[in-house]
Amino acid sequence: MRWVQRTSLVTQIAIAVVIGIVLAAVWPAATPHLAILGSLFISALKAVAPVLVFVLVMSAISNHTPGETTHIRPVLVLYAVGTLAAATVGVVASMWFPSTLTLQAPAQAAAGPGSVSEVLMNVLKSVVENPVKALLEANYIGILAWAIALGLALRHASAGTRAMLQDGAAAVTQVIQLVIRLAPLGILGLVASTFAEAGAQALWGYAQLLAVLLGCMLFVALVVNPLIVYVAIRRNPYPLVLMCLRESGVTAFFTRSSAANIPINLALAKRLRLNEDTYSIAIPLGATINMAGAAITISVLSLAAANTLGIQVDLPTALLLCVVASLCACGASGVAGGSLLLIPLACSLFGIGNDVAMQVVAIGFIIGILQDSAETALNSSTDVIFTAAACLAQERKAQV
């Protein structure tokens, strides 16, 4: 027990990853039992995250001091710039290193959105969702909308009511901290079950495609994002970027859920001493609309399909794909199947039929063991990186 208290959470997670891989290799029969740990951990995170976001945002807004600014707009600008930059990286990399896919007979099509307007309409409908249904289904746009509305209304409540909201937020935060302490056990189960079920064999056939996807995500995480952060804070961005990748990206990689990683990001933002009025809104919102990894996935797989079919993509169409991929990525959390089911929408730019596009989606699910994990790690870590950058930029301006 003392060792657990002395050792950092990141170190414990790293040890859990190694143990999980070893167990999957030498004792695969035990992995179904270990998988229970992973599923329980993800379920616990997903269960507490909607309540945490609702209570925390409502408490932060109702107790907001008049005259203080929340700096949400700079965070949203960083989210938009980061997502568009990621889509551009995906397009450029696909043109420099074109990938091909093995496409067979038409696959059974799943129901994906038909147009960009449909994706945006789904997002708008989420805003006016029934609040109870929004909490039950973890619709974070709806949760944020109701939390903001109730928080604004409760600004005029008595001091005792607002203090009760603060106490409620503190209580939920304590529950979250308990769940986060169990992360090493959960990740041990996730790693063991993932490696035992899929292994590395299923990925070799798509080695180049995976290399392009993961290379783009690494480039965005280690080059593009630090550059954006540097422009915002005007000092070395790497201490902040690497800390967020280590503290947020590692857990997101294994949970494969931006929503489940919201509590981890909120705890990290608190440790960084960011403005609570800013991060309590910006991080849950980022889990919904800040999707750099999804933009890369959509652009790379769409261009791989076009290249396989011999379709020549000109510069204007490539630029349009960057914009479409960015818009689609922002709506990815509102579509079952996330970024993969938005690929047919992007493929429609090249005149690729839905039957072929859904085969590309199927390939995406095959490589999802790495693609989805890396995508989520980039998405979720970028939420807290850009939120911190916006807060630090405002502090720098205030000191000038």
Curated annotation (Swiss-Prot):
Superkingdom, natural source: Bacteria
A Gene Ontology biological process term: threonine transport
Subcellular location: Cell inner membrane
Keyword Coiled coil part of the UniProt annotation: no
Pfam family name, one: SDF
Membrane topology term: Multi-pass membrane protein
Chief subcellular location: membrane
Function, in words: Involved in the import of serine and threonine into the cell, with the concomitant import of sodium (symport system).
PANTHER family (UniProt xref): PROTON/GLUTAMATE-ASPARTATE SYMPORTER, SERINE_THREONINE TRANSPORTER SSTT
Entry protein name: Serine/threonine transporter SstT
Provenance organism: Acidovorax sp. (strain JS42)
